[in-house]
A protein has these predicted regions:
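A solvent-exposed, acidic/Ser-Thr-rich amphipathic alpha-helical stretch
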Residues: 1-52
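Terminal "cap-and-tail" regions of soluble proteins that handle hydrophobic small molecules
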Residues: 76, 80-160
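Exposed boundary/loop context
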Residues: 24-25, 60, 108, 120
C-alpha cells in the first residue's frame, strides 16, 4: 500500500512505470531494520525516507517523508513479502529555490494526516487520489497494524 496506490504488486509496478514515463520522480531510501521471526513467518520494520519532486502551486518542491515499512513475511519455497504497510511519521515540503516558497491552501493541507500531509498535498495537487487513513505515529490505524503483526507471528491470517 502507498498513499496514492492500493492494489496488487503487479499493478503497482505498472502504474509506477507509467508515472516515470510521464516524469513522476519518487525516490525511496531505506535505513536500519529489525526482524521478528516465528517459524515460517516474520515481521520486519525498516526505516525509510520517501522523496518526491514536483510542482506545488507553481513552485518546484521536494517533499521528504520519513517513516517505516512494516513487512509481513512468510517462508514458502523462499522468504517473501506478503504485505508491506508504511507508517508515515513526519514530512516536510522544501522549495527547490528557498527564495520562492509555495503558497499552500491551509485548509487542504490540514485535511490530511499529520505524518504525510505535505506528501498528500503534493500528490493531490498533481492528480493522485490519496488514501486518507494510513498509519502514523499514533492512532487507531497504527494500533491495528501492530495488532495485525502480533497475530501474524502467532499464525493467524491477515485481515485485508
Amino acid at each position: 500500500m502507498a498513499t496514492w496506490f492500493q492494489g496488487p504488486a503487479d499493478d503497482f509496478i505498472r502504474v509506477s512505470r507509467e508515472g516515470f514515463e510521464r516524469g513522476v520522480r519518487i525516490l525511496h531510501f531505506l535505513g536500519g531494520s529489525s526482524v521478528d521471526v516465528a517459524g515460517k513467518r516474520a515481521l520486519s520494520q525498516t526505516k525509510m525516507t520517501i522523496t518526491q519532486r514536483a510542482d506545488v502551486e507553481g513552485v518546484e518542491c521536494d517533499v521528504v517523508c520519513t517513516g517505516r515499512f512494516v513487512d509481513f513475511l512468510e517462508r514458502r519455497d523462499r522468504w517473501g513479502i506478503v504485505l508491506r504497510q508504511p507508517i508515515y511519521e513526519s514530512d516536510r515540503i522544501i522549495p527547490v529555490d528557498p527564495a520562492s516558497p509555495p503558497q499552500l491552501d491551509r485548509g487542504l493541507l490540514e485535511s490530511f494526516p499529520e505524518g504525510y500531509r505535505h506528501l498528500a498535498y503534493l500528490q493531490t495537487r498533481n492528480g493522485f487520489t490519496v488514501k486518507p487513513d494510513m498509519p502514523g505515529l499514533k492512532g487507531p490505524e497504527v494500533e491495528a497494524l501492530y495488532a495485525s503483526g502480533r497475530k501474524w507471528l502467532l499464525g493467524e491470517n491477515l485481515d485485508r
